[in-house]
Amino acid sequence: MSQMTKFEEDYQRLVLQWANDRNIIDGSDNIKQLLKTLTEAGEFIDAVVSEDVDEFVDAIGDQWVTLVIGMEQSGVTYQKALDSAMCIDTSDDSLKNDTVILYAISCIADGILKDDKALLAQGYGIYLHVLRNLKTSFTFGVAAAWNTIKDRKGKMVNGVFVKESDLKDGQ
């Protein structure tokens, strides 16, 4: 059984406070958060394909932030997600990280649609394990994501947080 690290606990607390301060937890829902996760997963896969190390590390942290917020919205604790994940050895070359991430996303989506917390926890847990298995890139990615968002301002638009730099005139 995998335990939540002090590093994860500290950054989870920071991210959840940041998300609460911006009304992302209550002003949105886990479906919209899953869409953000899908966007970040696409950026992760693009970084892998293009062998862009900086973007790869950035995408790891961004995915983690969306998962932490999604778990909070879904009522799934971080440790419950870690405990619920099926054992998938992502170091095995026959199971590529992107394939496992897509499976995890499908579990999360199915869990949302069925309002099934066990399935949600399993999907979040599998996804977390993939990111954690990336070792050093995981800690750098999470820290970099936090440093990017910690002072970010924006507003909720149709249940989605839009950063200030992306807001169009009149929004």
PLM ranges: what are they?
Residues M1-Q171:
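Flexible "arm" and connector segments at domain edges
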